[in-house]
Amino acid sequence: MRLGLDPVLQDAIRLGTTVLATAGDDLSSERMQAGRVYVNYPASSPYVLGCGGTRIALDGARGSIVNETVWNDDGVHSTGGGISEEYQVPAFQAAARIPGSLNDGRRGRGVPDVAAAAAPTNGYRIFLNGVDFVASGTSAVAPLWGAFIALINARRGQSLGFVNDRLYQLPNLLRPIVTGDNKDTTGLGYNAAPRLERLHRGLGSPDGGAIVTALTTIA
């Protein structure tokens, strides 16, 4: 699949299309019980903006975010993320202190690139076909980031296209997530770490207004 899809993703970049994908909701182990960690494709492709998940706590009175951690529901469901064994560290992650894989210690493409609220308790209200329900997981995060990109494209009057390199040049526009992990019930997985050691939540979660403003005006 990787060999067949990557050329298509490269074509998308040449056409000015931003491609986003979810990091998955099954921890770093993908619940495989194989004693190894994995990353989801195509989020692991260097031609894709990989989207991971967080959990937010809100101030009940003001509705503002008071705390944000890696989304992990007791080692059963959690954001995916880790180190690719198929791709080397891409140029846009060269300044990030990507650690080695828990499998063999080798460094590679870090997944995801960005994150946003994904926990079921932070779900997104959806109204579809007359039904009102709540969606969550990284499958909700990727469309959220897609909406940011679409809004920016509309304001710019042209497509951002491949956005990874620009986001990594503007890390202060995202909230770093430095607590939590995506470990399973056996303890297998990655811990959150300070900015520039970005696993399972990427650069961080968005300050939507700041991102839209900055990327609307960027060349």
Give the positions of each predicted feature:
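Extracellular protease catalytic domains of secreted zymogens
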Residues: 1-219
